[in-house]
Amino acid sequence: MNRESFAAGERLVSPAYVRQGCEARRSHEHLIRLLLEKGKCPENGWDESTLELFLHELAIMDSNNFLGNCGVGEREGRVASALVARRHYRFIHGIGRSGDISAVQPKAAGSSLLNKIANSLVLDIIKLAGVHTVANCFVVPMATGMSLTLCFLTLRHKRPKAKYIIWPRIDQKSCFKSMITAGFEPVVIENVLEGDELRTDLKAVEAKVQELGPDYILCIHSTTSCFAPRVPDRLEELAVICANYGIPHIVNNAYGVQSSKCMHLIQQGARVGRIDAFVQSLDKNFMVPVGGAIIAGFNDSFIQEIGKMYPGRASASPSLDVLITLLSLGSNGYRKLLKERKEMFSYLSNQIKKLSEAYNERLLHTPHNPISLAMTLKTLDEHHDKAVTQLGSMLFTRQVSGARVVPLGSVQTVSGYTFRGFMSHTNNYPCAYLNAASAIGMKMQDVDLFIKRLDKCLKAVRKEQSKESDDNYDKTEDVDIEEMALKLDNVLLDTYQDASS
């Protein structure tokens, strides 16, 4: 509805009513205009009517939605199912062109605009979350692992001699396989135990750089967000090493946007040293479906190079999901979620601490990890290994997702590399433990229900252990009685034989 349409409507309905409707529409259009002008996340979230109006206006700019369109190419945005078309708000052409994921498509102005706005909003949120000097970023329709691979492949052209990636160990398969998939040899740097925490071995990293030679190292691949007792890598010190030796630095920041501590580490690393790109997951940080990531960095031209490395067009779904989410929340809504996550972390920490003490266990002291917590399972592990894994199974069958039990001595082979003590980020962690994390969107009732179910599971495992111990004791006692009876029989037999002779 434009001005002429409203004027025509005044001949059918009272002009006063039409003008009122026109003003109501203008309030929606005002929000859309501010978004296009500023390219920033609105402070307050939009309602669904504004969002749907905006998406509809964008969609009708794509050629597949033109009323008189005649498509004779091999890819004309045709969709067989109306349900599929509605699911995607009729954005069918995707984003980017064959040479650049950020390029504008001539036949899809609306989808191209959607892509640009989504990238702009995400950049604004990254700054809001703590990385104030980030220069550029883009949404890529791949999860974190493949997005890291794209970064490594972009660096390959800059460093033709390189064949190694230095990687402080974190027991998570996708980030390890991202290096293998890119065709490089991971050089695993074992972590060092400091108290309960597993921290970056900076001396080992620098020694390996000197041993292999900077020209033969593609990059250092560090990590922020991780499962306790591992903590975020020493990003500032690693960034200085990278700057001193002229080595690129790629950071796996999978679920770090929600943590001010992780974002501060990235900001400081870029300030004192070198960070080329940092990658974060969309689903873990923005509560959207799995399948998207954000590649960001402090050098605009390098981030553009990564975008140009992506082959072909790409799905617009992750960009659409995060755009809708951020416009619904607004910057104030996202800030509120970050604040609530911090509060839930403290609450979860206190509740696990109380429960662990009730079972003669303890909450591991990992102050450098702002998201994940770990509780020892020493008393279970002392009896036998099966009790630890049994606890994990019991939690899962009771609909507790996300909690991990980590037994001692687990061995796992990933892409031909064998890791001892897999899941614990080190070969020989002192004890078995259970992980839980306070991620964005967690509510107090989630924590309370988890603690209640964990308590029940621990009681059940302890009860079973006690029963097994009693059974074993009874069996041992029976064997002892049988042995004593046999000895007594032998003594009596010897006595009888002596008397007979």
UniProtKB/Swiss-Prot annotation:
Residues 1-44 are annotated as: Tetramerization. One of its GO terms (biological process) is conversion of seryl-tRNAsec to selenocys-tRNAsec. Pathway: Aminoacyl-tRNA biosynthesis; selenocysteinyl-tRNA(Sec) biosynthesis; selenocysteinyl-tRNA(Sec) from L-seryl-tRNA(Sec) (archaeal/eukaryal route): step 2/2. It comes from the Eukaryota. It catalyses: O-phospho-L-seryl-tRNA(Sec) + selenophosphate + H2O = L-selenocysteinyl-tRNA(Sec) + 2 phosphate. InterPro entries: Peroxidases_heam-ligand_BS, PyrdxlP-dep_Trfase, PyrdxlP-dep_Trfase_major, Sec-tRNA_Se_transferase, SepSecS/SepCysS. The modification Phosphoserine is found at residue 14. The modification N6-(pyridoxal phosphate)lysine is found at residue 284. Substrate binds at residues 97-98, 105, 313. Pyridoxal 5'-phosphate binds at residue 75. It is an enzyme of class 2 (transferase). GO terms for molecular function: O-phosphoseryl-tRNA(Sec) selenium transferase activity; tRNA binding. Its EC number is 2.9.1.2. Keywords: Cytoplasm, Phosphoprotein, Protein biosynthesis, Pyridoxal phosphate, RNA-binding, Selenium, Transferase, tRNA-binding. Gene3D superfamilies: Type I PLP-dependent aspartate aminotransferase-like (Major domain). Residues 96-106 are annotated as: Phosphate loop (P-loop). The keyword Cytoplasm applies. TRNA binds at residues 271, 398, 463. Belongs to the SepSecS family. Homotetramer formed by a catalytic dimer and a non-catalytic dimer serving as a binding platform that orients tRNASec for catalysis. Each tetramer binds the CCA ends of two tRNAs which point to the active sites of the catalytic dimer. Converts O-phosphoseryl-tRNA(Sec) to selenocysteinyl-tRNA(Sec) required for selenoprotein biosynthesis. This is O-phosphoseryl-tRNA(Sec) selenium transferase. It comes from Pongo abelii (Sumatran orangutan).
